[in-house]
């Protein structure tokens, strides 16, 4: 990551990935009446089928919201062994169709949230009870849901691995933030390098990244310094 023509041009500072967040309090109510199980959310097929069931059970409410619809299709297609892009742009092949169909069915029934804003917002208002979002967004999820009538409820939010397609590769998007440098005076360039070495030292990078909800960028930081 951060390379162009085999040259490192962006120095990584913090990383994140995508995970599934679930309002377990609301899910447990749904489960008690329908038999829905959390392990059904391990696959996209299971998640979208559950979204349809939830919409019917709840009278049209959305079950699921994805923060990054493009990522869903790109990662999903690649996980099924096809290239997402071709020379003309997006390759709308069989794997894309497979990813599209359950997504579209859930959207048509109302089980998939297609509103604007971040995925944290419909979970805070009770308009959805599950979302795929950046691991860094954990700081924006609330343990209190406030609905449109200003009624509040204390809830438990849990995190689960991002779903995969049945028979597909376990694949998930990663992202992060980094720093680019530009040519300057020798003194300023030296100061810049000194600062970056200081910030990316394993233990310090763990403290910096985790305080912001991100993950460290060094293997040493993961293995030795990341809090259990």
Enumerate the predicted regions with their spans.
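Short helix-initiation/N-cap motifs at beta->coil->alpha
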Residues: 42-48, 112-125
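Extracytoplasmic/periplasmic solute-binding protein
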Residues: 3-13, 18, 45-95, 128
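A structural signal for short loop-to-beta-strand junctions that line the ligand-binding cleft
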Residues: 1-27, 62, 159-172
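Extracytoplasmic/periplasmic substrate-recognition and gating elements
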Residues: 105-111, 147-221
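Glycine-centered hinge/linker elements that transmit conformational signals in sensory
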Residues: 48-53, 86-116, 162
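Short helix-loop capping/hinge motifs at secondary-structure junctions, enriched
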Residues: 26-37, 57, 185-192
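Short glycine- and hydrophobic/aromatic-rich loop-to-beta-strand nucleating segment
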Residues: 18-22, 77, 179-181
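Paired acidic/hydrophobic, glycine-rich loop segments that form the ligand-binding mouth/hinge
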Residues: 129-134, 140-141
């Amino acid at each position: 990551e951060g390379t162009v023509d085999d040259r490192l041009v962006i120095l990584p500072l913090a990383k994140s990935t995508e995970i599934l967040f679930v309002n377990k309090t609301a899910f447990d109510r749904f489960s008690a009446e329908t038999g829905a199980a959390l392990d059904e959310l391990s696959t996209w097929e299971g998640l979208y089928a559950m979204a349809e069931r939830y919409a019917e059970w709840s009278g049209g409410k959305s079950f699921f919201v994805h923060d990054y619809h493009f990522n869903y299709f790109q990662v999903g297609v690649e996980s099924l062994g096809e290239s997402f892009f071709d020379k003309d742009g997006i390759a709308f092949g069989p794997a894309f169709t497979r990813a599209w169909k359950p997504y579209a069915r859930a959207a048509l029934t109302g089980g998939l949230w297609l509103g604007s804003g971040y995925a944290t917002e419909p979970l805070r208002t009770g308009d959805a009870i599950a979302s795929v979002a950046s691991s860094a967004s954990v700081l924006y999820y609330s343990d209190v849901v406030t609905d449109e009538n200003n009624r509040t409820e204390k809830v438990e939010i849990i995190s689960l691995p991002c779903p995969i397609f049945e028979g597909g590769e376990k694949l998930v998007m990663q992202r992060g933030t980094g720093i680019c440098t530009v040519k300057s005076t020798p003194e300023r360039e030296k100061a810049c390098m000194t600062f970056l070495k200081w910030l990316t030292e394993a233990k310090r990078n763990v403290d910096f990244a985790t305080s912001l909800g991100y993950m460290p960028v060094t293997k040493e930081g993961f293995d030795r310094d990341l809090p259990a």
